Structures are given as C-alpha cells and as structure tokens.
Amino acid sequence: MPRSLANAPIMILNGPNLNLLGQRQPEIYGSDTLADVEALCVKAAAAHGGTVDFRQSNHEGELVDWIHEARLNHCGIVINPAAYSHTSVAILDALNTCDGLPVVEVHISNIHQREPFRHHSYVSQRADGVVAGCGVQGYVFGVERIAALAGAGSARA
C-alpha cells in the first residue's frame, strides 16, 4: 500500500553545488540559500499535514543511497539533481526502483533556456512532474504535487 503524507515524510534531495545557493551565480539561481529553500519546503508540507526529509550531497552515490532509502520510508521524492540531471543514468536507475513512489524533478533555472547540454534530463524519464524556471518556488510546487499524489494513494494520478 502506498505511504501517505500523513504517515511518511517527503524526501527532498538536492544535488551538487546546491549547498552554495545564494552565493553561486545569483543571476541564475537567485539569492535564497539552501536553508531558505528548506524552510519553504517545511512550510509547504506542513500546510498539507506532512513533513520533509531535506538533504543535499555533491556525491552521486550518496544521492543514489538516499533514493533507495526513500523507496522504503517516504511518501515521495522531490529531487533537484542539478548537473547530474544531464549525466546520471545511476540516479535514473535508482529512481526506477521506486515503483509507485511519486517523483517530481525541480530546477531553479529554466534548463531549456540555457546551454544545449542542459536541455536533456535523464531524471525526467522517471519523474511524474517536472518544474523548471520558477526559482525556489519550484520546490513548493514539487511538494504540493507530491502531497496531491501521495494523498491520492497513486503515484500517477
């Protein structure tokens, strides 16, 4: 039986360099820090009666391990894989082990308006939704979508 937001947190995963939000390329990513993003996610989940498990790593294998953990203990995944979006078959394969678990991919910038190599995302092949170009508010949209999907009891409602 799918886990609901009422009994399992949303896993929110952040990939490489997102620990530098607010410092790195603010003209692209804005001035909000990762702590600001976490606070937004906590508030958004709480509005739906839920909680979040918010993490960041610069290491692909650690993100894969956390995805494996999420498939057992969480009601959904919001993931900003950052640069791994364009390169990581390992993250795609890990997400593909999460049968029935809703996944939303988030990008702060609009990856389709950037360099051509950023236009393709492996993660999008598994994601139930993709949010790009909405700034850090995209994370709120991701949390809200997971809340809707987890509340409905179906990853692909």
UniProtKB/Swiss-Prot annotation:
<dbReference type="GO" id="GO:0003855">
    <property type="term" value="F:3-dehydroquinate dehydratase activity"/>
</dbReference>
<dbReference type="GO" id="GO:0009423">
    <property type="term" value="P:chorismate biosynthetic process"/>
</dbReference>
<dbReference type="GO" id="GO:0008652">
    <property type="term" value="P:amino acid biosynthetic process"/>
</dbReference>
<dbReference type="InterPro" id="IPR036441">
    <property type="entry name" value="DHquinase_II_sf"/>
</dbReference>
<dbReference type="Pfam" id="PF01220">
    <property type="entry name" value="DHquinase_II"/>
</dbReference>
<dbReference type="InterPro" id="IPR018509">
    <property type="entry name" value="DHquinase_II_CS"/>
</dbReference>
<keyword id="KW-0456">Lyase</keyword>
<feature type="binding site">
    <location>
        <position position="86"/>
    </location>
    <ligand>
        <name>substrate</name>
    </ligand>
</feature>
<dbReference type="GO" id="GO:0019631">
    <property type="term" value="P:quinate catabolic process"/>
</dbReference>
<feature type="active site" description="Proton donor">
    <location>
        <position position="107"/>
    </location>
</feature>
<protein>
    <recommendedName>
        <fullName>3-dehydroquinate dehydratase</fullName>
        <ecNumber>4.2.1.10</ecNumber>
    </recommendedName>
</protein>
<feature type="binding site">
    <location>
        <position position="93"/>
    </location>
    <ligand>
        <name>substrate</name>
    </ligand>
</feature>
<keyword id="KW-0028">Amino-acid biosynthesis</keyword>
<comment type="similarity">
    <text>Belongs to the type-II 3-dehydroquinase family.</text>
</comment>
<feature type="binding site">
    <location>
        <position position="118"/>
    </location>
    <ligand>
        <name>substrate</name>
    </ligand>
</feature>
<comment type="pathway">
    <text>Metabolic intermediate biosynthesis; chorismate biosynthesis; chorismate from D-erythrose 4-phosphate and phosphoenolpyruvate: step 3/7.</text>
</comment>
<feature type="site" description="Transition state stabilizer">
    <location>
        <position position="24"/>
    </location>
</feature>
<dbReference type="InterPro" id="IPR001874">
    <property type="entry name" value="DHquinase_II"/>
</dbReference>
<keyword id="KW-0057">Aromatic amino acid biosynthesis</keyword>
<feature type="active site" description="Proton acceptor">
    <location>
        <position position="29"/>
    </location>
</feature>
<comment type="subunit">
    <text>Homododecamer.</text>
</comment>
<feature type="binding site">
    <location>
        <position position="80"/>
    </location>
    <ligand>
        <name>substrate</name>
    </ligand>
</feature>
<dbReference type="GO" id="GO:0009073">
    <property type="term" value="P:aromatic amino acid family biosynthetic process"/>
</dbReference>
<comment type="function">
    <text>Catalyzes a trans-dehydration via an enolate intermediate.</text>
</comment>
<feature type="binding site">
    <location>
        <begin position="108"/>
        <end position="109"/>
    </location>
    <ligand>
        <name>substrate</name>
    </ligand>
</feature>
